[in-house]
């Protein structure tokens, strides 16, 4: 468990899981450099439709915040492809990348090294938001293996991780066994429509909440941001 934590910090990250650059531009214009936001998360839908460079260019018209690429899921290939992945992201102007290293520890180490060579921030995840993911809930992946992903990444010097808001008990068990540092950053999907409650994660000091449809489909995104900001500031 982490001790002597710094003050609680909440930030928001829009998950840009859309097809049209017009939607990206709309959200980027509204968010800008708002202090309640950490950055933007883009995935395969935008990357495969338009190319990541075009996505980055669109966001950069309105914001200097970090742009995170979530390949959904990266690091599930052989170790050697990590270098090509990292170079592709760097050329596009991406700042950070999320890895879910289900291909094993050799791939994890190689992909971390490749991202660092390209000066990209590394974020590692092992647990996902949906049901029937872990073996204990009817999924394919051994619970212990998921825990080992986090521990191995910590041993490799990673200090930024993905944990889902929708599974507080499972995250708690990971926190009890993995030696996360007090300054570790946690990126959490599940805020908004999936019903995740950040107040259930008292052990996390630096918490970046990933929000998708609740913001992207809001009738009034500006009002949604104002309401969310008020709630998160009161919880800090």
Give, region by region, the residue ranges found by the protein language model.
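A C-terminal functional module that forms or caps the active site or interfaces directly
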Residues: 165-215
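Glycine-rich phosphate-binding active-site loops on the catalytic face of alpha/beta enzymes
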Residues: 92-104, 191-196, 205-224
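Conserved N-terminal beta1-alpha1 strand-loop-helix module at the mouth
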Residues: 1-68, 76, 141, 152-155, ...
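Active-site-proximal loop/turn and secondary-structure-junction residues that shape catalytic pockets
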Residues: 18-20, 44-48, 73-75, 101-103, ...
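Conserved anion-binding
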Residues: 76-169, 182-183
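Alpha-helix-loop-beta-strand connector modules within alpha/beta enzyme cores
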Residues: 52-71, 115-127, 174-191
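Short acidic active-site motifs
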Residues: 23, 51, 84-85, 107, ...
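Hydrophobic faces of well-ordered beta-strands that scaffold small-molecule active sites
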Residues: 10-16, 38-42, 67-71, 97-99, ...
